Swiss-Prot record:
It comes from the Bacteria. Residues 255-264 have a biased composition (Low complexity). The gene is fliY. Its EC number is 3.-.-.-. This is Flagellar motor switch phosphatase FliY. GO terms for cellular component: bacterial-type flagellum basal body; plasma membrane. Pfam families: CheC, FliMN_C. Belongs to the FliN/MopA/SpaO family.
Amino acid sequence: MENNRLSQDEIDALLNGTGSTLDEPEIPEVDDLSEMERDAIGEIGNISFGSSATALSTLLNQKVDITTPSVTVIPRSKISDAFPEPYVAIEVNYTEGFSGSNLLVVEQSDAAIIADLMIGGDGKGADPSLGEIHLSAVQEAMNQMMGSAATSMSTVFSKKIDISPPRVELLDVTEEKGTDRIPDDEMLVKVSFNLKVGELIDSSIMQLYPLTFAKDLISSLMNSESAEEEETVQPEVTYEQPKEPVTPEPRIEPKQQQQPPKRQGTAKKAAPVQVSPVEFSAFDPNEAVQAPIHNLDMLLDIPLSITVELGRTKRSVKEILELSAGSIIELDKLAGEPVDILVNQRIVAKGEVVVIEENFGVRVTDILSQAERINNLK
């Protein structure tokens, strides 16, 4: 700068600087998720997709890991940057428990490997171009995955959650193919998971749903946790209150009631009648109670076989002989219907299938009455 005047180079530098700053703020500030809300969404996805990985592993006969969720909020106008390659989109609508939908997105090459494994192939050299048979196989795999996820979400939110059969379509944002499946909301939440299938796939699988639906999930999660805390606190208060008045009063009153009749009986014969036998009668019931307890302890160590029956079906010999890897057997129970819990091959209860870490489990929902158990023995 000379004589308080800017040189041409300085003017150009200022113009270039202002131009670059004007190009940056393209996305306006909008409602976003806090760090705690992102963690909540990630935890929901972690639990639900943990069970989905188990279901997919059973279908593909491969080790499946779905881990490390990453939560981001993206505007719909930038969806092409988030999905630059051809994908396969699976649309899932909630029919009970929640009102909304989400989009499950996998790379087209990964979907081709999954489809090849589903129809009995080895997954190697799978053709990325998906036909109707391959799309149907992917749809069935995603149906099993999302069904398991809905069951896990029912456990997390303490209410029944059900979904409609998923719809599969090719998604290519650059060519505007399948974009009608993307939610119309301006702001979308993308939850990305690492997907590993044996030695064949090491990629990612993504969930996409509206920001408003994510807020509903978080709100329901917080409400279910607060309700559980209230349920655990209330029984403690009601249980402690009767202990204080009940324990001292009955012990004092019977002694006062027993003494007057004994004194009336001793008015004529005070010497021969004494209360000493009462002390021996107090010890006799205790000894009688302890004996069966020891006998019961011996029975409590007997192991019993517990079986959970998912369902049954009948097939002809021809159909059995035609079974191969990837075949699907339809059972006589509907999805979400309680399963039977058997002890030594006898039904004693009903429950819901849950996933505990990497293992299946059953939450008991109904215990059969004694009359029902007797009827099952006939």
